[in-house]
Amino acid sequence: MKNKTEYYDQFISKIPNFPKKGVLFYDITSVLLKPEVYSSLINEVYSFYNFKKIDCIAVVESRGYLIGAPLSLKMQLPLVLIRKEGKLPREVFSEEYELEYGFGRIEVHKDDVRTYSNILLIDDILATGGTLKSSAILLERAGGKVKDIFCFIELCAINGRQSLESYEVNSLVRYN
């Protein structure tokens, strides 16, 4: 996927010391304030994945939803939600994950994933790779197979891609 850092960087807000001191938070919600930029993002991802063999899109709560939901509609594919612990009403698989700034737990409905063999997993940012790795493990434990991973932003210096080396990982914006 072509690196589009120069273009999108101007629309991404950077908030120092959030959610805790020493962390620089990359806020993609500012992209949503510019419909033409948001549309461009969705179209870029669509153009890259439209001709790949994808049968489902899985998204990580919550900012992954902002990319995955419109993309699933555009590609006419099912959308599977990966949520934080305690937010899903049916029986779930769960997995602990490590963040750049702590730990958490994610869940997916047991019966949402079982037949998909070419899942595109989407999140807004790749930092440590902990959330995405745990999400991939979760989807595979539920019977699916992750084919590709897409993140809008990749923090290359943290080297989260290394923990995802068994997957094809793509990003549009790469910060060193």
Curated annotation (Swiss-Prot):
Its EC number is 2.4.2.7. GO terms for biological process: adenine salvage; AMP salvage; purine ribonucleoside salvage. This is Adenine phosphoribosyltransferase. GO terms for molecular function: adenine binding; adenine phosphoribosyltransferase activity; AMP binding. Gene3D superfamilies: 3.40.50.2020. Pathway: Purine metabolism; AMP biosynthesis via salvage pathway; AMP from adenine: step 1/1. The gene is apt. Homodimer. PROSITE patterns: PUR_PYR_PR_TRANSFER. Catalyzes a salvage reaction resulting in the formation of AMP, that is energically less costly than de novo synthesis. It is found in: Cytoplasm. One of its GO terms (cellular component) is cytoplasm. It holds the Pfam family Pribosyltran. SUPFAM superfamilies: PRTase-like. Belongs to the purine/pyrimidine phosphoribosyltransferase family. Keywords: Cytoplasm, Glycosyltransferase, Purine salvage, Transferase. It catalyses: AMP + diphosphate = 5-phospho-alpha-D-ribose 1-diphosphate + adenine. It comes from Borreliella burgdorferi (strain ATCC 35210 / DSM 4680 / CIP 102532 / B31) (Borrelia burgdorferi).
